[in-house]
Design a protein with these regions (language model features):
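Contiguous, well-folded functional domains in the mature portion of proteins
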Residues: 1-416
Length: 416
C-alpha cells in the first residue's frame, strides 16, 4: 500500500432545490415544542444555561442565550441562522457549540432526547448538510485557502489537491468538497519500520492520546467492572457501550483516541493488515458533553442526582459510530471505532463485509463535523506507542500525528 487512493468529491447541489423544504421543516419546530413538557424544558434549559454566567468559561455562552430567555429571539430563528451557516476559520463550529452547551443542561438533555424533538433535529442536520454540500456554501473558502491553522493545529492547503489551484476558492464547488479534499500524491507515505508485521500505523490525522495504557487486573470480574478514567478529568469512557458485543475482549488493553480537528484530513485508513470479521453502524445522539465540568469548582454546574453526566467522553459511546473488528495474525482482534461529533451527518464506510484490508488502506471518511478514531487492543499484548520521538501520553497532552505514519509496535517477549 504505497499511495493513498483519492475519492471522488461529492457533486454539489443547487440550494434552491432544498431551501423551501428546509425552511418548512424549521417551521414545524413550533408543533414539536407543543408536545408535553418540550417548551417548558426548553425554557428551563435556557434558565440553567444563563444561570452559569458566574462560571468564567461559560459567561460568553450564557450571554449568547440570554436574548432567547428574554423572548427577544426564538429557537426557530436560531435554527434558521444555523441552517445556512458556512464554517469560518475563526468559528468553524459556531452554532453546534452553543447548541451543545444548551442541550447538555439537565432540561436540555431531556428535550434533545424527546421522541418528537430528536427526529426533528436529525432531519434539520441533514438539511444543514445539504447546505454545506451546495454551491451556495463557498463564501468562506477564500479564507480557508489562506488559513495556516493554529499553533496546536497547523494547516497547509499545499498538502492537498485543489480542482483549480489558481482560484481564490481552490476551485472547490461547495464547502463539503473542501472538507473532503484529497491529499496530493506522495503525501503521507506509509511507515516503513521493520518488522512490518509488528507495526501499527496511524489511522488518521489528529492528536493522539491514551484513554488507557493497559493495566488489566488478573481477576476477570475486576476487569469487567473497570471504567476508563481520563487523567486530570472527571470523565469516563465506557468501552462496553461504545463497542457492543466485542467490548469485553478489549477491556484492560491499551486504548487510544485520535481527535480530528476541522482542518485535518478527514479520511481514515487501516491501522493494521487483516480480515474485517465484523463491521456496522451504530446510531447515537447528535450531541455530546463538553469536558469543562470541574467538581472542585464552587461555581461549577450541579449534576442531577440521577445523572452520569460528567463530560463529553462519558457520552462517547452514545454518538453515531462505525465499528470495524479486524482479525490479525500478530495482534489478535483489533477494534477501530469511527465516532462522529459536532453534528457529523455521515460516516462513510468503503470496506465490504468479510474483506481483507491492507495496512494504510483507505477505509472511509467523515462528513463535515468533529470526529474521533478510537483504537482498542487486547490486554495480553505488549505494545509501545510513540509519534516520531514523542511518546503517546494522556488526554491532557495529545501528540499531533499524520495518517499512515508509524504509531505503535508489538514488543518481543523478554527472554535470556
Amino acid at each position: 500500500m504505497s499511495e493513498i487512493t483519492s475519492i471522488t468529491l461529492p457533486v454539489p447541489i443547487d440550494w434552491s432545490t432544498k431551501s423551501k423544504a428546509a425552511e418548512e421543516h424549521i417551521k414545524k419546530l413550533k408543533d414539536v415544542l407543543k408536545h408535553p413538557h418540550n417548551e417548558s424544558n426548553y425554557i428551563s434549559a435556557l434558565v440553567e444555561e444563563c444561570a452559569e454566567e458566574l462560571i468564567p468559561n461559560r459567561k460568553q455562552v450564557a450571554s449568547y442565550w440570554e436574548p432567547y430567555l428574554m423572548g427577544e429571539l426564538t429557537l426557530e430563528s436560531f435554527f434558521l441562522e444555523w441552517l445556512t451557516y458556512t464554517p469560518t476559520t475563526l468559528s468553524p463550529g459556531k452554532y453546534i457549540e452553543y447548541w451543545d452547551y444548551l442541550v447538555n443542561t439537565q432540561s436540555g438533555l431531556i428535550l434533545s432526547n424527546d421522541a418528537y424533538f430528536k427526529p426533528w433535529f436529525k432531519d434539520f442536520l441533514n438539511f444543514h448538510g445539504d447546505w454545506i454540500n451546495s454551491t451556495s456554501s463557498t463564501a468562506t473558502l477564500a479564507d480557508w485557502m489562506k488559513f495556516g491553522g493554529t499553533k496546536a493545529h497547523p494547516f497547509n492547503i499545499e498538502d492537498y489537491e485543489r480542482p483549480d489551484p489558481t482560484s481564490s476558492t481552490g476551485g472547490f464547488k461547495s464547502f463539503n468538497q473542501f472538507f473532503l479534499r484529497n491529499l496530493k500524491p506522495g503525501q503521507r507515505p506509509i511507515c516503513n519500520a521493520e518488522p512490518a508485521d509488528d507495526v501499527i500505523v496511524a489511522p488518521c490525522d489528529g492528536g493522539v492520546f491514551y484513554l488507557d495504557r493497559g493495566s488489566a487486573p488478573g481477576n476477570t470480574e475486576e476487569v469487567l467492572s473497570r471504567d476508563y478514567d481520563l487523567p486530570g478529568k472527571s470523565d469516563r469512557f465506557d468501552l462496553l457501550e461504545a463497542l457492543p458485543g466485542y467490548g469485553p475482549y478489549f477491556l484492560g488493553g491499551q486504548l487510544l483516541d485520535i481527535l480530528l480537528w476541522f482542518t485535518d484530513y478527514h479520511h481514515f485508513h487501516a491501522p493494521v493488515t487483516g480480515e474485517v470479521i465484523h463491521q456496522g453502524l451504530y446510531e447515537g445522539s447528535y450531541n455530546y458533553d463538553f469536558g469543562d465540568y470541574n467538581p472542585e469548582d464552587f461555581y461549577a454546574p450541579k449534576l442531577p442526582s440521577d445523572s452520569d453526566k460528567v463530560g463529553w467522553y462519558d457520552k462517547l459511546g452514545k454518538h453515531q459510530r462505525y465499528v470495524w473488528i479486524i482479525k490479525t495474525e500478530r495482534f489478535g482482534l483489533v477494534a477501530m471505532i469511527a465516532i462522529g461529533f459536532w453534528g457529523v451527518g455521515s460516516i462513510v464506510n468503503a470496506i465490504k463485509d468479510k474483506s481483507k484490508v491492507e495496512k494504510g488502506q483507505y477505509m472511509g471518511h467523515f462528513g463535515y463535523g468533529g470526529s474521533s478514531i478510537v483504537l482498542a487492543f487486547k490486554p495480553s499484548l505488549d505494545l509501545q506507542f510513540k509519534v516520531g520521538e514523542k511518546p503517546v501520553e494522556g488526554p491532557d497532552k495529545p501528540v499531533l500525528m499524520e495518517v499512515r505514519k508509524c504509531l505503535g509496535k508489538r514488543m518481543k517477549p523478554f527472554s535470556w
